[in-house]
């Protein structure tokens, strides 16, 4: 009987680690977290990055980075200094179409719930992750497609025939 219990414990432990691995693998495979009200309205999706996050808006990427070690020290009560060094910058696609469409593709099986405060208007439930995000017609005849490949975030500018790739111009803030 003891041996069966030991095997059961090993099996449960193995299943737990496989589940955790599956969840983390899916987060990197499906990095785009849909905004269902848990983020400012102009944000379409968020991507968690090592030491920060990427917020995707129409024609704009906002990167936000912070000191991971300091955050861990505060969380684990290893310091009384509550200040965290952080910085942000924006990548802006200049002169984009006002009527571009943004959509997320390939919904994950898993989801998250966000309960922000006591006001249900700020709650977001069943927030799925997605494999890719497309901003269709960001410029006339040009689409922007974002996706994850081997754990890295990528984006392609898809230029249709007879479209001018010189329209794509970026500025940084």
Regions found by a protein language model. Name each.
Residues 1-28:
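Bacterial Sec-dependent N-terminal signal peptides
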Residues 2, 23-173:
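Extracytoplasmic/secretory N-terminal segments
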């Amino acid at each position: 009987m003891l041996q069966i219990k030991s095997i059961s414990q090993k099996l449960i432990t193995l299943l737990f680690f496989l589940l955790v691995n599956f969840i983390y693998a899916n987060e990197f495979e499906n990095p785009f977290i849909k905004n269902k009200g848990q983020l400012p309205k102009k944000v379409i999706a968020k991507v968690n990055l090592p030491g920060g996050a990427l917020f995707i808006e129409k024609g704009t990427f906002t990167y936000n980075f912070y000191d991971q070690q300091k955050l861990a020290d505060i969380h684990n009560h290893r310091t009384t200094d509550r200040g965290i060094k952080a910085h942000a910058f924006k990548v802006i696609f200049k002169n984009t179409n006002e009527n571009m469409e943004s959509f997320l593709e390939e919904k994950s099986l898993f989801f998250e719930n966000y309960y922000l405060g006591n006001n249900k208007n700020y709650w977001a439930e069943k927030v799925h992750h997605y494999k890719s995000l497309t901003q269709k017609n960001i410029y006339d005849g040009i689409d922007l497609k974002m996706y994850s490949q081997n754990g890295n975030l990528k984006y392609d500018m898809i230029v249709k025939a007879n479209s001018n790739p010189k329209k794509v111009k970026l500025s940084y803030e």
